[in-house]
């Protein structure tokens, strides 16, 4: 049966579960489930092989930027040019975000492994991963823009406008939509995840 004719969100005939004695057995069984699944799993494959890798790279890079920003905040040029009242909060924010963003990297590795096995545990971890990364990305982007406004608003030679605030709002809305769509997509494919 072609995938174009498969309209149900669960298997008409569940693939026969083989004897599973190792992780390689679970991976082979997961691949068979994906092959036989009645709904399209194109986004699933993209999410597993592309999104998780990009998320790890971007989060690792952002964590490094946060650490660099902490040290840069103590430089004389920043101390003299930025609004002094906002600097302590900016430093604290970057320290916290560097930890939260760095934590995403091992989570991406675990997520990739979980999506290779498609167990019930994998589905629970997937929901946690989506919520955690969406929240961290939204806070990281929006707070960075807002701190930029707080640090350099009214400072000569720094172009701060309403665009920064609008971009902060947009990033939160975008990540909320991203989260909802992904949760819905994987919920419709809940039957993929089984022990």
Q: What do the PLM-derived regions correspond to, one by one?
A:
Residues 64-78, 118:
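Membrane-helix exit/juxtamembrane interface segments
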Residues 40-43, 109-122, 176-195:
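Cytosolic juxtamembrane helix at the C-terminal end of the final transmembrane segment
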Residues 1-14:
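N-terminal targeting leaders characterized by basic, low-complexity, disordered sequences
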Residues 48-70, 102-104, 134-145, 174:
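Canonical alpha-helical transmembrane segments of integral membrane proteins
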Residues 72-92, 140-167:
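Interfacial non-cytosolic loop connecting adjacent transmembrane helices
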Residues 12, 18-68:
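Cytosolic juxtamembrane helix and N-cap/initiation of the first transmembrane helix
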Residues 106-141:
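Loop-to-transmembrane helix junctions at the membrane interface
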Residues 90-111, 170-175:
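Generic alpha-helical transmembrane segments
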């Amino acid at each position: 049966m072609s995938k174009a004719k498969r309209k149900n969100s669960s298997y008409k005939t569940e693939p026969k579960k083989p004897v599973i004695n190792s992780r390689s057995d679970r991976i082979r069984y997961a691949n068979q489930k994906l092959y036989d699944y009645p709904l399209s799993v194109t986004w699933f494959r993209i999410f597993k092989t592309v999104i998780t890798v990009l998320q790890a790279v971007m989060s690792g890079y952002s964590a490094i930027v946060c650490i660099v920003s902490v040290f840069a905040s103590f430089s004389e040029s920043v101390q003299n040019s930025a609004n002094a009242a906002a600097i302590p909060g900016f430093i604290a924010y970057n320290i916290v975000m560097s930890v939260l963003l760095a934590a995403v990297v091992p989570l991406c590795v675990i997520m990739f492994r979980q999506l290779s096995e498609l167990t019930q545990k994998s589905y629970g971890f997937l929901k946690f991963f989506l919520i955690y990364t969406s929240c961290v990305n939204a806070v990281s982007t929006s707070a960075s823009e807002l701190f930029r406004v707080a640090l350099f608003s009214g400072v000569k030679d720094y172009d701060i406008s309403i665009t920064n605030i609008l971009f902060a709002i947009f990033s939160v809305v975008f990540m909320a939509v991203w989260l909802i769509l992904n949760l819905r997509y994987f919920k419709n494919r809940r039957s993929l995840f089984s022990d």
